[in-house]
C-alpha cells in the first residue's frame, strides 16, 4: 500500500501541527498501528525486546522522513544518496526532518579523533596560530593531515607499522613454491603474477639465493615502469616491491581489515619514534602557549583542558575560546570529561560515540528537527544518565522533538510522553499497549508498567555467607593504580561506577589474578564475535548442520542442498538474503533480495519438507517456537534453549548476527558457554538492550550458575542487577584521571549503611 502525506489544516484532529500522526503502520510485525507523537517533547518508546519499537521508529518514521528529504535533492544527488524503501504505512502527518543518533561505532578512519570529529582541534589550531610562540605558521601548520604540520616519518598517524619479513616470506622457497604468507600473494593469485610475470626473477630460484639487487627489487622497489616488460605483463601496470605494496594497498585499508588476523602475524605497531605519538613535526611542537604545545593540550582530559583554556586571557582569541568552551561544555555535561582529544574515534564504544554525536548536536544551530536515539542509556551509570538527560532537555528546549527507544526506568520516568509497544516479542508484539504521560503509564497494566511498579528486593547476603575469597594487592592497569581488595568466590559480584572509572581495567586485573591461580576464566565481552551477513544464531552455535541433516535424511538428498552457502543458495544474492551496495565513502546500503525475498534459498529447495515444514519455514521461526518444534531432538533443543535462557527467544533462526546489538551478540556468546564447565565468568554489561522483564530471566540464569559453584563477575549499571548482587565493588569517584579508585566494596547491606554518594542514592 502506498504511503501518502496529507497537509493538515488548522482544524484537523491532529491540531496545530503539534502532533506527528502515524496511520495504519504495518511494517514487519506491526499490526496496523495508528498513534500520535507530540512534537517538541521527549517521547520514550518502550516494550519488551523484539516488540516492534525499532520497526515503528526507525523503519517507519525515520525511513519516511529520510525518503521525503532525499526527494528534495536533484537527481544527481539522489543517485549517490542511500536509498530508503517505502515503509508499509498508510499515512504520516506533520513529519519533521529526522536525525537518527544510533549506538554504532564511528568510522574506522585512523585519522579521525575526538578532536577532529568535534571540531575542537580545528579551533585549537586557530588558537596556536594566533597567540602561540614562536609563530610557526597558520592553522595548517598544526594539522597532522597537512604536509606543513604532519610528522613525515609516520605520515601524521602517530604510529608506524613494521613488517617482519621472516614471518611474511619463506626465504627457503622459490616464487613458484608459494613463499609469501598472505592470501592475495598466493601462487597463481593476481598479486603473485606481478612478480612471476615481471621477467625480473627466476621463478625456481630460492629467494635466499637472490643477489642483493634481486632481493631489493623483490622487497623494496618503489613503483616504476618496467624497462622491457614481458608479453604477459599488463600494459598499464606498474611494478612495486613487496613491502611498499603491502604498506600502500593493504595496511590501513578495507582489505587489511578483512585479513586482520593474517596481518597480525607479520605486522607490528609501534609509537612513532620521531613524534612520540603526537602526529606532528618538530616545528609545530615548538610553538607553545603558557608552556604547553598543542600535543600537550590534546593529551589532557577534557576536564583539564577546559580549566587551561579558561585561564587564557587574550582578546585576539576570545571568539576561538568561546567556540572551544561551548563544545567542551557539551561533552563534559554529557559525562565524557574523562576522554581526551587525541583519542581515536574507532576506539570509542558505541555508547561513547553516540554521546559525542549528541553533544555535537547540542551545539548545532538547527531546530525544529526530530532527534531519534536508540537506547542512549546503554553502558551508563545512573549518575551518567542524569547528565545525558540534561543534554536531551537542552536539545528539546531548543525547539526540537526527541524520541528515544529505551528500556531504562530513569529515562522512562523523565519522559514527557510514553508509548509502550507489545505485548510480546515478534509475532506476539506489534501493537500499541499504551500512550500517555508517566503518571498515566504507572496506572496501566502493560508488562513494562507492571515491572516498573514492582518493589525490588535487595540482596541480604552478609560477609559470613562467603567461604572462599580472592585477594588483590597493589595492582596497576591504565587508570587503576595501587588497587587492593578482596572478592568472594562462588558468588555474583558486580563492578559498577561512572563511565571511565576503571571497571574494565579492574575486571582485567581480577581475570589475571584468577588465571595465575590456575582457575578457568571465561571472558564474555561485547566485542565483535566474528560475524558476517551469513552468520545466524544457528551457525554460531553450530547446530545448523544437524537441522540440514534432518532434511537430507527425510528426503534422501545431500545436506548441502539445504545450505544457503552451497547448493541451496539463491542465485541472485548468493545466500545472503540481501543485496549490499557499496557506497564508497558512506555506509553500505543493504536491500532485500528481490528474487528470494530475503529467504536465502533457491526455489528447488522449497520442494522438500520435514514434518510438513520447508527449510525456509523453520528458519522463519523464532528461537522459542523452534524449541517446541525440535523438542524431541536433544542436541538441537538444548542449544536453542540456551538462547532462550539468555532472553533472546524472540530472535529468528535465520536472523543475521550483523543486525544484532552489542548486548544481543554478547548474550549469544554467553549462550554458547552455558553447557561448558567453568568456574569464573566475567561479563561486560549483559543487560544492554534488555527490557526489565528480560533481565529477570538473566538473573535467574546467573542464580543457577552460582548454585552450580561458579563465580560471576559482571560490569553492570542496571539497578535491577545491582540490587541482586552478592558483592558490590564501586569504582570512581569520576572517570579518567579522577577515577581508578575502589570507593566501595561490600554487600548491598553494607552499601545501605555507607556514606556512598554515587550508586546508593539511586537504589
Where on the chain are the PLM-derived regions?
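Conserved catalytic segment of ABC-fold P-loop ATPases
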Residues: 401, 414-420, 723-730
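H-loop/switch region of ABC-family ATPase nucleotide-binding domains
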Residues: 405-407, 715-717
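ABC-family nucleotide-binding domains
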Residues: 374, 380-381, 684, 690-694
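P-loop/Walker A nucleotide phosphate-binding surfaces of NTP-dependent enzymes
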Residues: 3, 7-347, 353-369, 391, ...
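Conserved beta-strand-loop-alpha-helix hinge in the C-terminal portion
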Residues: 115, 420-453, 730-762
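Conserved D-loop/post-Walker B switch-helix segment of ABC ATPase nucleotide-binding domains
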Residues: 381-390, 692-700
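Flexible nucleotide-interacting loop at or near the entrance of a catalytic core
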Residues: 442-480, 762
Amino acid at each position: 500500500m502506498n504511503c501518502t502525506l496529507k497537509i493538515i489544516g488548522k482544524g484537523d484532529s491532529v491540531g496545530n501541527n503539534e502532533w506527528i500522526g502515524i496511520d495504519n503502520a504495518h511494517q514487519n510485525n506491526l499490526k496496523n498501528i495508528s498513534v500520535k507523537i507530540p512534537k517538541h517533547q521527549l517521547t520514550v518508546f518502550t516494550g519488551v525486546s523484539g516488540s516492534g519499537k525499532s520497526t515503528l521508529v526507525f523503519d517507519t518514521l525515520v525511513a519516511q522522513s529520510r525518503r521525503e528529504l532525499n526527494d528534495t535533492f536533484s537527481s544527481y544527488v539522489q543517485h549517490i544518496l542511500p536509498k530508503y524503501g517505502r515503509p508499509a504505512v498508510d499515512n504520516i502527518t506533520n513529519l519533521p526532518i529526522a536525525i537518527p543518533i544510533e549506538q554504532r561505532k564511528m568510522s574506522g578512519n585512523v585519522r579521525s579523533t575526538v578532536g577532529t570529529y568535534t571540531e575542537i582541534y580545528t579551533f585549537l589550531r586557530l588558537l596556536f596560530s594566533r597567540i602561540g610562540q614562536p609563530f610557526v605558521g597558520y592553522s595548517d601548520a598544526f594539522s597532522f593531515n597537512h604536509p606543513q604540520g604532519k610528522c613525515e616519518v609516520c605520515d601524521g598517524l602517530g604510529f608506524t607499522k613494521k613488517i617482519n619479513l621472516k614471518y611474511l616470506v619463506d626465504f627457503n622457497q622459490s616464487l613458484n613454491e608459494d613463499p609469501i604468507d598472505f592470501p592475495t600473494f598466493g601462487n597463481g593469485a593476481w598479486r603473485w603474477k606481478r612478480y612471476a610475470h615481471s621477467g625480473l626473477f627466476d621463478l625456481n630460484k630460492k629467494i635466499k639465493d637472490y643477489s642483493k639487487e634481486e632481493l631489493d627489487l623483490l622487497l623494496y622497489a618503489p613503483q616504476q615502469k618496467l624497462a622491457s616488460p614481458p608479453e604477459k605483463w599488463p600494459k598499464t601496470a606498474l611494478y612495486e616491491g613487496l613491502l611498499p605494496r603491502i604498506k600502500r594497498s593493504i595496511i590501513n585499508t578495507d582489505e587489511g581489515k578483512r585479513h586482520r588476523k593474517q596481518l597480525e602475524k607479520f605486522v607490528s605497531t609501534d609509537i612513532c619514534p620521531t613524534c612520540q605519538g603526537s602526529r606532528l613535526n618538530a616545528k609545530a611542537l615548538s610553538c607553545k602557549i603558557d608552556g604547553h604545545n598543542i600535543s600537550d593540550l590534546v593529551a589532557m582530559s577534557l576536564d583539564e583542558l577546559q580549566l587551561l583554556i579558561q585561564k587564557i586571557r587574550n582578546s585576539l582569541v576570545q571568539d576561538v575560546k568561546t567556540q572551544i568552551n561551548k563544545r567542551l561544555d557539551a561533552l563534559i555535561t554529557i559525562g565524557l570529561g574523562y576522554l581526551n582529544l587525541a583519542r581515536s574515534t574507532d576506539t570509542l564504544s558505541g555508547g561513547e560515540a553516540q554521546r559525542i554525536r549528541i553533544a555535537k548536536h547540542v551545539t548545532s544551530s538547527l531546530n525544529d528537527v526530530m532527534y531519534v536515539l536508540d537506547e542512549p542509556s546503554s553502558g551508563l551509570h545512573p549518575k551518567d544518565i542524569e547528565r545525558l538527560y540534561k543534554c536531551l532537555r537542552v536539545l528539546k528546549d531548543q525547539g526540537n522533538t526527541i524520541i528515544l527507544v529505551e528500556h531504562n526506568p530513569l529515562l522512562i520516568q523523565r519522559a514527557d510522553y510514553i508509548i509502550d509497544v507489545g505485548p510480546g516479542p515478534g509475532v506476539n508484539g506489534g501493537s500499541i499497549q499504551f500512550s500517555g504521560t508517566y503518571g498515566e503509564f504507572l496506572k496501566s497494566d502493560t508488562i513494562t508498567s507492571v515491572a516498573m511498579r514492582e518493589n525490588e528486593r535487595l540482596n541480604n547476603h552478609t560477609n559470613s555467607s562467603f567461604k572462599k575469597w580472592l585477594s588483590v594487592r597493589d595492582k596497576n592497569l591504565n587508570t587503576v593504580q595501587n588497587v587492593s581488595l578482596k572478592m568472594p568466590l562462588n558468588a555474583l559480584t558486580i563492578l559498577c561506577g561512572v563511565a571511565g572509572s576503571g571497571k574494565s581495567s579492574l575486571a582485567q586485573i581480577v581475570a589475571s589474578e584468577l588465571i595465575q591461580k590456575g582457575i578457568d576464566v571465561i571472558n564474555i565481552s561485547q566485542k565483535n564475535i566474528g560475524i558476517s551477513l551469513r552468520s545466524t544464531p544457528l551457525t554460531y552455535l553450530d547446530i545448523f548442520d544437524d537441522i540440514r541433516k534432518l532434511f537430507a535424511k527425510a528426503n534422501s538428498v545431500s545436506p548441502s542442498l539445504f545450505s544457503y552457502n552451497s547448493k541451496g543458495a539463491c542465485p541472485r544474492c548468493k545466500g545472503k538474503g540481501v543485496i549490499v551496495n557499496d557506497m564508497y565513502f558512506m555506509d553500505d546500503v543493504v536491500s532485500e533480495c528481490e528474487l528470494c525475498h530475503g529467504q536465502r534459498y533457491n526455489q528447488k529447495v522449497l520442494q522438500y519438507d520435514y514434518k510438513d515444514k520447508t527449510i525456509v519455514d523453520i528458519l522463519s521461526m523464532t528461537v522459542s517456537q523452534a524449541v517446541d518444534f525440535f523438542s524431541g531432538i536433544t542436541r538441537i533443543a538444548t542449544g536453542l534453549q540456551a538462547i532462550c535462557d539468555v532472553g533472546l527467544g524472540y530472535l529468528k533462526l535465520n536472523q543475521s548476527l550483523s543486525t544484532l546489538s552489542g548486548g544481543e551478540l554478547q548474550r549469544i556468546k554467553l549462550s554458547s558457554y552455558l553447557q561448558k564447565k567453568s568456574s569464573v565468568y566475567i561479563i561486560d554489561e549483559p543487560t544492554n538492550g534488555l527490557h526489565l522483564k528480560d533481565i529477570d530471566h538473566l538473573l535467574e540464569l546467573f542464580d543457577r550458575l552460582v548454585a552450580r559453584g561458579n563465580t560471576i563477575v559482571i560490569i553492570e549499571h542496571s539497578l535491577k542487577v545491582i540490587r541482586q548482587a552478592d558483592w558490590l565493588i564501586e569504582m570512581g569517584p569520576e572517570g579518567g584521571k579522577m577515577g581508578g579508585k575502589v570507593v566501595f566494596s561490600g554487600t548491598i547491606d553494607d552499601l545501605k549503611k555507607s556514606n556512598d554518594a554515587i550508586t546508593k542514592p539511586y537504589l
